[in-house]
Amino acid sequence: PPPGKKTRGRVKIKMEFIDNKLRRYTTFSKRKTGIMKKAYELSTLTGTQVLLLVASETGHVYTFATRKLQPMITSETGKALIQTCLNSPDSPPRSDPTTDQRMSATGFEETDLTYQVSESDSSGETKDVLKPTFTVTNLPGTTSTIQTAPTTSSSMQVSSGPSFPITNYLAPVSASISPSAVTSANGTVLKTTGASAVTSGGLMQIPTGFTLMSGGTMAQQVPVQAIQVHQAPQQTSPSSDSSTDLTQTSPSGTVTLPATIMTSSVPTTVGGHMMYPSPHAVMYAPTSGLADGGLAVLNAFSQTPSAMQVSHSQVQDQGGVPQVFLTAPSGTVQIPVSAVQLHQMAVIGQQSSSGSSLTELQXVNLDTSHNAKSD
């Protein structure tokens, strides 16, 4: 072309890294906008789910995500996973793109990722995510109105701070549907909350059938394990008196929980008895005799013959709170439980109108010399 003439039409540029910083920045911002627009157009025109993530060399992350895929970015686990990936050491710079199929211009079909497509996809998008895990036929002491809602939704929420280990990312299930399970009148919600994370609201839902394995690797990151099991039966006048609270906290610095916490472990009512699951044992008490501290511990570890003993302290006055001490010989059980409090308000099955009968359960850890540390 003559000297004064600018190039007309399209110019094919070389597919290689742009060394000029200014030109590279300009190309990035222009093409980022373009690819975001393309992603939006693709999802709108075809009604498909699109997730696009662009990380700039200045450390900024730009995303486009349709509604179903937004939890991949907004949830705490999703954020942590993205952070981990972006902070990982660089692969060999600008290697031949043909080595990685996903880096080819046409993309790559993830054959092991599929999802359910139904006829009316837009009508109920959350219907596959939360299935009822068990059926409540009748609870002692509740009114017969529970028969109208025989299925009980059960959800498990794991929330933690930035230090939450990424290995617990089990399933990218949307967290936006959790309120539907929480607000149901006879819903049972099992929450596991990390200590550093009481304020951070990142929720992750694990479908039933998954097992949350707490190994020794989590000792530093999740210092306190608290498990709350709420069971509020549906009745004509629901009040806080009929809820059963099981709170287990452990203030010690490193907690190793070798037990597996199943999402299906909710209090089960068997013939007037309440079974309270806990990470180390199943606490079992008849509902009628909770006030006198009659509580047996079924040990979860069968390989240790004498793992836990239960000793009762006598209740002298009528206003006293019965205390039960769980003692574990050192070396048999790996769970240092420092305080277990069991508040039983108006035991289900004998809905007393006079108020709440309070049962407090304290588990005290024994050190090597078997001296009970008094709280």
From Swiss-Prot:
InterPro entries: MADS-box/MEF2_TF, SRF-like_MADS-box, TF_MADSbox, TF_MADSbox_sf. SUPFAM superfamilies: SRF-like (SSF55455). It is found in: Nucleus. Pfam families: SRF-TF. Keywords: Activator, Developmental protein, DNA-binding, Nucleus, Phosphoprotein, Transcription, Transcription regulation. SRF is a transcription factor that binds to the serum response element (SRE), a short sequence of dyad symmetry located 300 bp to the 5' of the site of transcription initiation of some genes (such as FOS). Together with MRTFA transcription coactivator, controls expression of genes regulating the cytoskeleton during development, morphogenesis and cell migration. Binds DNA as a multimer, probably a dimer. It comes from Gallus gallus. The lineage of its organism: Eukaryota, Metazoa, Chordata, Craniata, Vertebrata. It comes from the Eukaryota. Residues 10-64 form the MADS-box domain. One of its GO terms (biological process) is positive regulation of transcription by RNA polymerase II. This is Serum response factor. One of its GO terms (molecular function) is DNA-binding transcription factor activity. GO terms for cellular component: nucleus.
